[in-house]
Amino acid sequence: GLPICGETCFTGKCYTPGCTCSYPICKKN
């Protein structure tokens, strides 16, 4: 599957549903 939580979260927020910020990268919740 494709990584859906790979965005960076320097602002402390993830914009992908079901993801949480594991600074500095969003990870699956």
Curated annotation (Swiss-Prot):
TM annotation in the entry: none
Keyword Disulfide bond attached: yes
Disulphide bridges: 5-19, 9-21, 14-26
The name this protein goes by in its record: Cyclotide mden-B
Domain comment in the entry: The presence of a 'disulfide through disulfide knot' structurally defines this protein as a knottin.
Pfam families: Cyclotide (PF03784)
Gene Ontology process terms (BP): defense response
Covalent cross-link (Cyclopeptide (Gly-Asn)), residues: 1-29
PROSITE patterns, per the entry: CYCLOTIDE, CYCLOTIDE_MOEBIUS
The keyword Nucleotide-binding is annotated on this UniProt entry: no
InterPro entries: Cyclotide (IPR005535), Cyclotide_moebius_CS (IPR012324), Cyclotide_sf (IPR036146)
Post-translational modification: This is a cyclic peptide.
Domain of life: Eukaryota
Role, per record: Probably participates in a plant defense mechanism.
Keyword tags: Disulfide bond, Plant defense
